[in-house]
Amino acid sequence: MQLKKQLIVIFFTYFIVVNESEAFFGALFKLATKIIPSLFRKRKGREVMMKRDLEQLFDPYQRNLELDRLLKQLPNY
């Protein structure tokens, strides 16, 4: 019974410490984004640029000329 109580206390202590540290680091990250926004804007700009490149890559209306050339070589195309 004593071991069971100890394990419950350890579990709740671990839960409280992890929860508080998550809140603490979240607050630090928010503060850092407000103080130094230029570091985080650059990263977002790169992601937007990469997303735009992917949208152009998978654009359904963009013709794949190499595929068309290969398909024209088939007799039924």
From Swiss-Prot:
Tissue: Expressed by the venom gland.
Identification of the protein by name: Antimicrobial peptide megicin-18
Keyword Coiled coil: no
Family named by the database record: Belongs to the non-disulfide-bridged peptide (NDBP) superfamily. Medium-length antimicrobial peptide (group 3) family.
Domain remarks: Amphipathic and cationic peptide with an alpha-helical structure.
Organism: Mesobuthus gibbosus (Mediterranean checkered scorpion)
Function according to Swiss-Prot or TrEMBL: Antimicrobial peptide with potent activity against bacteria. Acts by fastly disrupting the bacterial membrane. Shows activity against Gram-positive bacteria S.aureus (MIC=1.5-3.0 uM) and S.epidermidis (MIC=1.5 uM), M.luteus (MIC>48.3 uM), B.thuringiensis (MIC=1.5 uM), B.subtilis (MIC=3 uM) and Gram-negative bacteria E.coli (MIC=12.1 and >48.3 uM) and P.aeruginosa (MIC=12.1 uM), as well as against penicillin (MIC=1.5 uM) and methicillin (MIC=3.0 uM) resistant bacteria. Antibiotic activity is not affected by major negatively charged components of the prokaryotic cell wall (e.g.
Localization: Secreted; Target cell membrane
